[in-house]
């Protein structure tokens, strides 16, 4: 058992209403934490006790500096430390979090998301591969917006393959814009979440931000741009090569996709799966992988994904 004394400032927030925050920390680390005033005792496995002590003392220090936290922020940080014991609270709250356009603060919610952000900041080409809901596209768009606002790039180009779920644009009703918009809607949603509506509209009108089907990139060279290819598992080998060779000087590219959700016709090779094999050892290119543990949607989504994966594995052994 470890006995520590914590300063009073922020202690009530740290523990939460009816000690709900501390109970959550106890469940994550399998420790017991009791407090009488400022005196706190921690009981459990020695390694877990040390981790719990560091969390409490680090948060107390941040509270002492005048920082404030919501219950959600506290619990997200608890979960990340439980996942990665080398996790730094101070770095997380002072470096990892960012506000791309002054509207909304963005923060990684898992170790893989932190790795992904760092990779995008440091490399010219990054592949984010994993199941839906892991923040691959949203974080890439957020970093693109930040790069644009900080004048690191002159424009943002967001692209998706225009063929998904077996539908071809030519067989859908309406004009081209009406046909294309549903496929690109997730990219618009991310932008509107990060930037005020009027500002996004102006940037789109000026083509500072461009959202288009992947086919529209053929024959172009994109310099000083932040380029994102979403749903890349639905590119063919030729399309992926075409996309990667569009990258010009001063540009950065992020490619996201889920290799378990390929909607290409039978016999067509996924460009994302091939790129993973062909490019994994090239300097300047990094692959970051996400699992169901990184899912940041409703907590049931993580459980649903895991259940389907287990079902798929069982079928493969029949």
Q: What are the functions of these language-model segments?
A:
Residues 10-29:
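Short amphipathic alpha-helix segments
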Residues 29-32, 287-288:
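A short linear hydrophobic-aromatic micro-motif
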Residues 32-35, 282:
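Short, flexible turn/loop "capping" segments at secondary-structure junctions
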Residues 34-93:
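Interdomain "pre-motor" coupling segment immediately N-terminal to P-loop NTPase/helicase cores
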Residues 39, 101-229, 233-318:
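Conserved helicase motor core of SF1/SF2 NTP-dependent helicases
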Residues 78-109, 121:
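Proteins enriched for Cys/Gly/acidic motifs involved in redox and nucleic-acid/cofactor modification
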